[in-house]
Amino acid sequence: MKGGKRTQKAADKNRINEQITGVDEVRLIGTDGEQAGVVSINEALDAAAEAGVDLVEMSPNAEPPVCRLMDYGKFLFEKSKEQKEQKKKQKQIQVKEVKFRPGTDEGDYQVKLRNLRRFLEGGDKTKVTIRFRGREMAHQELGIELLNRVKNDLEEISIVESFPRRAEGRQMIMVLAPNKK
Protein backbone atom coordinates (compact mmCIF):
# COMPACT_ATOMS: atom_id res chain seq x y z
CA MET A 1 0.00 0.00 0.00
CA LYS A 2 1.47 3.33 -1.02
CA GLY A 3 1.49 6.31 1.31
CA GLY A 4 0.25 4.42 4.37
CA LYS A 5 2.59 6.19 6.75
CA ARG A 6 1.63 9.67 5.61
CA THR A 7 -2.03 9.17 6.39
CA GLN A 8 -1.18 7.81 9.82
CA LYS A 9 1.02 10.81 10.65
CA ALA A 10 -1.68 13.22 9.47
CA ALA A 11 -4.01 11.76 12.10
CA ASP A 12 -1.44 12.44 14.84
CA LYS A 13 -0.92 16.08 13.89
CA ASN A 14 -2.86 18.88 15.52
CA ARG A 15 -4.63 21.34 13.23
CA ILE A 16 -3.08 24.80 13.27
CA ASN A 17 -4.15 28.32 12.26
CA GLU A 18 -6.31 28.26 9.08
CA GLN A 19 -6.57 24.45 9.17
CA ILE A 20 -9.05 24.79 12.05
CA THR A 21 -12.35 24.83 10.17
CA GLY A 22 -15.97 24.01 10.79
CA VAL A 23 -16.16 25.82 14.15
CA ASP A 24 -17.29 29.32 15.05
CA GLU A 25 -15.95 29.47 18.61
CA VAL A 26 -12.99 27.98 20.45
CA ARG A 27 -11.88 27.84 24.07
CA LEU A 28 -8.62 29.79 23.98
CA ILE A 29 -5.59 29.21 26.19
CA GLY A 30 -2.93 31.94 26.10
CA THR A 31 0.83 31.54 25.66
CA ASP A 32 1.28 31.63 29.45
CA GLY A 33 -1.22 28.78 29.97
CA GLU A 34 -4.00 31.06 31.28
CA GLN A 35 -7.52 30.53 29.92
CA ALA A 36 -8.78 33.44 27.83
CA GLY A 37 -12.30 31.99 27.68
CA VAL A 38 -14.51 31.19 24.69
CA VAL A 39 -13.80 33.45 21.70
CA SER A 40 -14.63 33.40 18.01
CA ILE A 41 -12.19 31.63 15.70
CA ASN A 42 -11.31 34.93 13.99
CA GLU A 43 -10.45 36.59 17.33
CA ALA A 44 -8.26 33.62 18.23
CA LEU A 45 -6.43 33.78 14.87
CA ASP A 46 -5.92 37.55 15.31
CA ALA A 47 -4.54 36.99 18.82
CA ALA A 48 -2.12 34.37 17.47
CA ALA A 49 -0.93 36.68 14.67
CA GLU A 50 -0.52 39.56 17.13
CA ALA A 51 1.58 37.43 19.50
CA GLY A 52 3.61 35.99 16.60
CA VAL A 53 2.71 32.39 17.45
CA ASP A 54 0.42 29.67 16.08
CA LEU A 55 -3.13 28.78 17.08
CA VAL A 56 -3.00 25.04 17.78
CA GLU A 57 -6.08 22.86 18.27
CA MET A 58 -5.32 20.75 21.36
CA SER A 59 -8.56 18.77 21.79
CA PRO A 60 -10.84 18.85 18.76
CA ASN A 61 -13.54 16.69 20.37
CA ALA A 62 -14.28 19.15 23.20
CA GLU A 63 -17.25 21.50 22.88
CA PRO A 64 -16.09 24.12 21.91
CA PRO A 65 -12.66 22.84 20.71
CA VAL A 66 -9.72 23.80 22.94
CA CYS A 67 -7.03 25.82 21.15
CA ARG A 68 -3.75 27.14 22.49
CA LEU A 69 -1.43 29.96 21.45
CA MET A 70 2.09 28.51 21.07
CA ASP A 71 5.08 28.10 18.79
CA TYR A 72 4.07 24.92 16.94
CA GLY A 73 7.58 24.07 15.72
CA LYS A 74 8.90 24.19 19.27
CA PHE A 75 5.93 22.10 20.45
CA LEU A 76 6.68 19.37 17.88
CA PHE A 77 10.38 19.40 18.80
CA GLU A 78 9.61 19.02 22.51
CA LYS A 79 7.13 16.24 21.78
CA SER A 80 9.60 14.24 19.66
CA LYS A 81 12.34 14.80 22.24
CA GLU A 82 10.03 13.46 24.96
CA GLN A 83 9.18 10.37 22.88
CA LYS A 84 12.87 9.64 22.23
CA GLU A 85 13.56 9.97 25.96
CA GLN A 86 10.79 7.50 26.81
CA LYS A 87 12.06 5.07 24.18
CA LYS A 88 15.55 5.23 25.73
CA LYS A 89 14.18 4.45 29.19
CA GLN A 90 12.39 1.30 27.98
CA LYS A 91 14.58 -1.74 28.44
CA GLN A 92 14.20 -4.38 25.80
CA ILE A 93 13.84 -7.73 27.57
CA GLN A 94 15.34 -10.54 25.56
CA VAL A 95 14.87 -14.26 26.00
CA LYS A 96 18.22 -16.07 26.02
CA GLU A 97 18.32 -19.81 25.48
CA VAL A 98 20.68 -22.38 26.99
CA LYS A 99 20.44 -25.97 25.74
CA PHE A 100 21.17 -29.06 27.81
CA ARG A 101 21.11 -32.79 27.09
CA PRO A 102 20.02 -35.38 29.67
CA GLY A 103 23.62 -36.61 29.91
CA THR A 104 25.26 -33.18 30.34
CA ASP A 105 28.47 -33.66 32.38
CA GLU A 106 29.35 -31.64 35.48
CA GLY A 107 31.87 -29.33 33.78
CA ASP A 108 29.49 -28.43 30.96
CA TYR A 109 26.67 -28.03 33.47
CA GLN A 110 28.68 -25.48 35.49
CA VAL A 111 29.57 -23.46 32.37
CA LYS A 112 25.94 -23.39 31.22
CA LEU A 113 24.78 -22.51 34.75
CA ARG A 114 27.27 -19.61 34.80
CA ASN A 115 25.83 -18.35 31.49
CA LEU A 116 22.28 -18.63 32.85
CA ARG A 117 23.29 -16.70 35.97
CA ARG A 118 24.90 -13.96 33.82
CA PHE A 119 21.79 -13.63 31.61
CA LEU A 120 19.46 -13.42 34.63
CA GLU A 121 21.63 -10.86 36.41
CA GLY A 122 21.63 -8.83 33.18
CA GLY A 123 17.83 -8.66 33.41
CA ASP A 124 17.02 -11.07 30.57
CA LYS A 125 14.60 -13.98 30.68
CA THR A 126 16.17 -17.35 30.01
CA LYS A 127 14.83 -20.44 28.30
CA VAL A 128 16.34 -23.73 29.47
CA THR A 129 15.87 -26.42 26.83
CA ILE A 130 16.56 -30.12 27.36
CA ARG A 131 16.87 -31.95 24.02
CA PHE A 132 16.35 -35.70 23.82
CA ARG A 133 17.84 -37.87 21.08
CA GLY A 134 17.01 -41.44 20.18
CA ARG A 135 16.45 -43.70 23.19
CA GLU A 136 16.87 -40.81 25.64
CA MET A 137 13.10 -40.24 25.18
CA ALA A 138 12.53 -43.33 27.34
CA HIS A 139 14.22 -41.54 30.27
CA GLN A 140 12.35 -38.26 30.49
CA GLU A 141 12.73 -38.31 34.27
CA LEU A 142 16.44 -37.44 33.75
CA GLY A 143 15.33 -34.26 31.99
CA ILE A 144 12.96 -33.35 34.84
CA GLU A 145 15.76 -33.99 37.38
CA LEU A 146 18.11 -31.73 35.42
CA LEU A 147 15.51 -28.94 35.21
CA ASN A 148 14.84 -29.23 38.95
CA ARG A 149 18.59 -29.02 39.62
CA VAL A 150 18.87 -25.85 37.47
CA LYS A 151 15.80 -24.39 39.20
CA ASN A 152 17.26 -25.06 42.67
CA ASP A 153 20.71 -23.70 41.75
CA LEU A 154 19.21 -20.42 40.48
CA GLU A 155 16.31 -19.98 42.93
CA GLU A 156 17.93 -17.00 44.72
CA ILE A 157 18.15 -14.90 41.52
CA SER A 158 15.21 -16.14 39.44
CA ILE A 159 11.61 -17.24 39.44
CA VAL A 160 10.19 -20.02 37.27
CA GLU A 161 7.69 -18.71 34.73
CA SER A 162 6.88 -22.05 33.14
CA PHE A 163 7.88 -25.59 34.03
CA PRO A 164 7.13 -28.57 31.74
CA ARG A 165 4.96 -31.43 32.94
CA ARG A 166 6.10 -33.64 30.06
CA ALA A 167 8.22 -33.43 26.91
CA GLU A 168 6.94 -31.40 23.97
CA GLY A 169 8.13 -33.33 20.97
CA ARG A 170 11.75 -34.22 21.67
CA GLN A 171 12.43 -31.42 24.16
CA MET A 172 11.46 -29.95 27.52
CA ILE A 173 11.44 -26.19 28.01
CA MET A 174 11.56 -24.20 31.26
CA VAL A 175 11.44 -20.39 31.29
CA LEU A 176 13.14 -18.42 34.08
CA ALA A 177 12.66 -14.71 34.77
CA PRO A 178 14.97 -12.54 36.89
CA ASN A 179 13.82 -11.68 40.43
CA LYS A 180 12.40 -8.18 40.84
CA LYS A 181 14.86 -6.19 42.90
Curated annotation (Swiss-Prot):
- From the Swiss-Prot or TrEMBL record, what is one GO molecular function term? translation initiation factor activity
Question: Any keyword Cytoplasm?
Answer: yes
Keywords from the named record: Cytoplasm, Initiation factor, Protein biosynthesis
Q: Which GO terms describe its biological process?
A: ribosome disassembly
Alphabetical list of Pfam families matching this protein: IF3_C (PF00707), IF3_N (PF05198)
Please provide, in alphabetical order, the Gene Ontology terms of the cellular component aspect for this entry.
Answer: cytosol; membrane
Q: How does it assemble?
A: Monomer.
Its job: IF-3 binds to the 30S ribosomal subunit and shifts the equilibrium between 70S ribosomes and their 50S and 30S subunits in favor of the free subunits, thus enhancing the availability of 30S subunits on which protein synthesis initiation begins.
Q: Which NCBIfam families match?
A: infC (TIGR00168)
Q: Which family does it belong to?
A: Belongs to the IF-3 family.
Return the HAMAP family for the record. IF_3
Question: Could you tell me what this protein is called?
Answer: Translation initiation factor IF-3
